[in-house]
């Protein structure tokens, strides 16, 4: 128990520090609420949200997804500090009213043991992480690409200073408490429920124990109180902000962008984000929840290929700017505008246009921050307000506006891909069991047409009653939306929703994950609620029900997970299950499933030249596939997305590798035709007006050196082998009694004319 003078001083000090800390937390709340209202539901199903927040926080499940050793040491600090909320309260009371743990029986002994052991673990955890960050060489060190825009406070090493302050506080706080507990043991004798304190007790004598007890009390509790004033500005605030992020997490899949109200008639329309206050308030909460662990940067395909974008730097820059506003322009908390645009301190325009919207940063973030959504809002402002649009995107926009497709090919040619096949439109077959959403790529791009033709031949073979919209179908607007042109997206989407609501499809199947995501998930925001599947999911059901049977091939096959099929929509098993019956040798890429590496096409990147970097994203991914397939005689890289296929096909030197890049549907058709005796002929699309595809690199070396950025190379450990899939019966519509489909033409497939587009050359780095 404290002497009377110490009690009075402690109460005065506590009152002052709690007042300062409370004011700091209130101002922090005001800064976060300076953001605009969010269009997403954040607090519906509150019981489920609270349960999710508690479970995710207490299990540290998202933290342990990556870096298991670092996460292990971090858990020492987390669990120790969580328990220290109780320890500090009990210790504070003990300074005024003696608390006898022995009188509490088993509960007291358990409490004493946990307080003692966790004190030791916290100290071990802090020392380990300090050594890792500041002394041990690591490719995950806290560093950024030279192209990345960094806040002036980052360049002034304030992040390092903050880390040192927080580490010193934890060491002093917990160390003081441990010494105070050890001094008590030195007087009372060894305790079995306090092994760490007993070990330290040999440093003290009964004569100096009281002074060390007083020091321990003030050192432990005084440091906590003193830290309250700094706490709202430090990185340690994430210990409170992370549970709030879990509580307010979006309840839609990551592929669904937030809705935007298009008020073009307003005097000053607010479309997208120009400044901090234009971001929705959860985006500002992101900045304070950020752990600054750089895991998002580790997996970002733009960062991995030497580009200016770092999702980690984006969040850190936001937080530092918010803290600067708190110190120098407090009016921001009361509605005053911030002085600087986001592109002046958060990220550069080059970085804003480098994002592929692959969602890897969202998947890996321990606190569920969403830097991708910041970038989308910045693009919205740049496109719809500032008019700053990459030239090549303007060409794609014009195509979508005039011809309903980004290639700009005449809309009347939308059904030309189906020449010679038994494909009926909804005008001819108004109530099909399946509506095949063809998409722009399969309608106009020769490579993607092979997928569409293979898929409809499989549907015919299985006797599925299907139809397409034909010329009633237009671009979903996915690329326009991810490029920031929400207005164009709504024009296209509204037209499609009106068409689909009139058709009333029972089931929509798409071969393009981007179309699947837009029609199945994003159209719900504008009145379009449909059941949509990826073609691999539907084909898996046809195989499982016995309506399709395939022979097993001899090729060695690996599979590339498309971002919008896998991470954004959670479809991983269906394509793998099909491949496992098509080949006896299916190998996984090192970066697979939710950890898959982007092909580089998403986020409207397909329609523009990549931003400056050390290599193309698709080249990085293709190199990984080449390594996985090794020296096999027959090698196949399977895909489930037309854009992935085109990007990976464009890799320089691919022809020398003899790697065939095929959609899963193409491979399944080969197996089905082989089993039925039709040979391995796959009917390709007829000659048509060619669509410009992706750039073909002509001068890059075959083995470009990856940027020295964390996790540019695949992990050394291979993914575990998965059990071979055995088809099970699935409930599918029975074949209709419609007239037998016309036989598939057996004419030899014409070779697709070469795709021509200007070569890509890395731009000079501007320092």
Q: Predicted regions: what is each one?
A:
Residues 2-135, 278-287, 309-315, 322-518, ...:
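Iron-sulfur-cluster electron-transfer modules
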Residues 93-110, 143-154, 182-212:
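Membrane-interfacial helical/loop segments at transmembrane boundaries in membrane proteins
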Residues 21-41, 94-98, 128-145, 179-192, ...:
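Juxtamembrane/interface segments at transmembrane-helix termini
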Residues 75-86, 164-185:
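Hydrophobic alpha-helical membrane-insertion segments
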Residues 13-21, 122-126, 171, 210-247:
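Alpha-helical membrane-embedded segments
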Residues 212, 228-355:
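Ferredoxin-type iron-sulfur electron-transfer modules and their immediate structural context
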Residues 32-57, 137-158, 192-202, 240-270, ...:
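Juxtamembrane inter-helical linkers in multi-pass membrane proteins
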Residues 203-208, 258-269, 371-751, 755-766:
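Iron-sulfur cluster-binding electron-transfer modules in prokaryotic oxidoreductases
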